[in-house]
Every structure is written in structure tokens, then in C-alpha cells.
Regions:
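Flexible, surface-exposed loop/gating regions in the mature catalytic domains
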Residues: 2, 45-79, 84-85, 95-119, ...
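Aromatic-rich peripheral "rim/lid" segments of glycoside hydrolase catalytic domains that contact
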Residues: 5-7, 12-15, 26-30, 34, ...
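Alpha/beta-hydrolase active-site loop
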Residues: 18
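Aromatic- and acid-rich polysaccharide-binding/catalytic face
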Residues: 37, 43, 99-105, 117-146, ...
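Structured alpha-helical segments in the cores of large, soluble enzyme domains
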Residues: 84-93, 121-122, 157
Length: 242
């Protein structure tokens, strides 16, 4: 508030609704011809901490969200992740009728975090508030293990089983400074694309993989360190095996 104290959840409800309403109105007013086909309503709300996913519905620890890395000012105000459903409720109210509403997160293939995201998103989907899950997909090139190919594809299929769509929103596959080879990277890129196409050809639910976004044009223009070499083109813009 004006004195620097945390506001109540009811005050934040009003602020949230006002912001979401005005944001959608501004987009439609300033860009009347834009096809706003999808919108990321809430981003990175589930904790990486297994204790939080096991006991707090996956809500992050409360904190200011700035100096306290990994903590959430939203949880500081609401006490839990109840703000997520409120955000989707307001977004559904004010978004264009044909705009799909998404939840997006990272490390979304970790089993305990995956299950917390699934539970939250299934509840939102069942209430008619959510249309899709965004998988950020910043992953290493290993084929096995908790971040391996099977773990990733299992997570993708679990989200699709909700009945909602999935978009792979920020895909890059890191070599981790030579820990993995270009061939391993290519194999993992191929496996992910193949699994998405296979699902869409023979789906086991109403959900589809509707987009894949590669998170950068080449290795010289990446948010990752130079040794990651995580993209489809190298630093000289030459195509890699992937």
C-alpha cells in the first residue's frame, strides 16, 4: 500500500481484475486486427522444492519475489496459490472468446513438480478456465534420468491427458559444456518432435500439441552460456545435426 505494507487479498483481487481487464482492453484497442489466439495468464507459480509440492500444493515460499529468489509476493499476500484460479477467472471474463488461456512453467518434467502442475491445471480445466499448458522445455541433451527424454515425454502426455492443449514454449537442449554430444542433442530434438507429431496423429485425449517455439535463432543469441550450444544453429548460423 502507500505505506509500504502488504495489501490484503481482497485489495489485490480488485487490482488483479482491473489490470487484466485493462490489459485485454488495451490490446484490443491498440491492435484491433490482431488475432490474440492465446495468452499466458500465469507463469512459473509452482515451486521446484519437493517439500512445497508435497505439502503446499506446489505454492512457492512467501517473500518479496525480488531479493528473495524463488519466493513469491503473491503467496505472501494470498498464503497459497489461490490467486492463480482468480487470475484465470478474470482472464476468461475479459479475454476475447477465441483466446486460449495458458499456464506456463519450467522444470515441468520433474516428477514432483509435474504432478503439482497437473493437479492445478486439471482443476482449472475442469472449471472451464484453462485451455492449455506451456512447457518451457529448457532441458539438457541426456537421454536418461530425471531430465531425460522419457521423463519429458511422460510429462507432455500427462498434461495432454487433461484434455487441454500443450505448447512447447521455450525449447532449447543444452550440451552443458561438452557433457553431451551433438548427436545426443539431435536425438532428443527428434524424439520430442516425433512424440508431439505421433500424439497429434493418434491422440488419447482432446488435447493437441499446437506449437513448438525454439528459444533463440542460434547459439550466439541465446540466454544460456556459450558452452550450452542449445539451439538448432551454431554461433556462425550454420545448421547443426538437430
Amino acid at each position: 500500500d502507500a505505506n509500504g505494507a502488504w495489501v490484503s487479498s481482497s485489495v489485490m483481487d480488485a487490482r488483479m481484475e482491473s489490470y487484466i481487464k485493462n490489459m485485454f482492453n488495451a490490446i484490443q484497442t491498440q491492435y484491433p486486427d490482431l488475432n490474440l489466439y492465446a495468452y499466458d495468464v500465469c507463469n512459473e507459480c509452482i515451486s521446484d522444492d519437493g517439500t512445497r509440492t508435497a505439502n503446499y500444493g506446489g505454492a512457492r515460499e512467501p517473500g518479496d519475489g525480488k531479493t528473495e529468489n524463488g519466493k513469491s509476493a503473491w503467496v505472501q499476500i494470498y498464503g497459497d496459490n489461490s490467486f492463480v484460479e482468480k487470475a484465470f477467472t478474470y482472464a476468461r471474463k475479459y479475454a476475447p472468446d477465441d483466446c486460449d488461456l495458458y499456464y506456463n512453467d519450467y522444470n515441468e518434467y520433474w516428477d514432483h513438480k509435474r504432478d503439482a502442475i497437473y493437479t492445478m491445471c486439471k482443476s482449472l480445466y475442469d472449471k472451464g478456465l484453462l485451455d492449455g499448458v506451456g512447457m518451457q522445455s529448457h532441458i539438457p541433451a541426456n537421454a536418461t534420468g530425471f531430465a531425460g527424454t522419457d521423463s519429458y515425454i511422460t510429462a507432455m502426455k500427462k498434461y495432454l491427458s487433461i484434455g487441454c492443449d500443450v505448447q512447447i514454449t521455450e525449447l532449447d537442449i543444452s550440451l552443458e559444456n561438452g557433457k553431451y554430444t551433438l548427436q545426443e542433442q539431435a536425438d532428443k530434438y527428434k524424439a520430442i518432435f516425433q512424440s508431439a507429431m505421433d500424439w497429434n496423429i493418434n491422440p488419447a485425449s482432446d488435447g493437441r500439441v499446437t506449437a513448438v517455439c525454439i528459444w533463440g535463432p542460434n547459439d550466439a543469441n541465446s540466454w544460456l552460456s556459450s558452452g550450452s550450444n542449445a539451439l538448432l544453429y551454431d554461433s556462425n548460423n550454420q545448421p547443426k545435426l538437430a
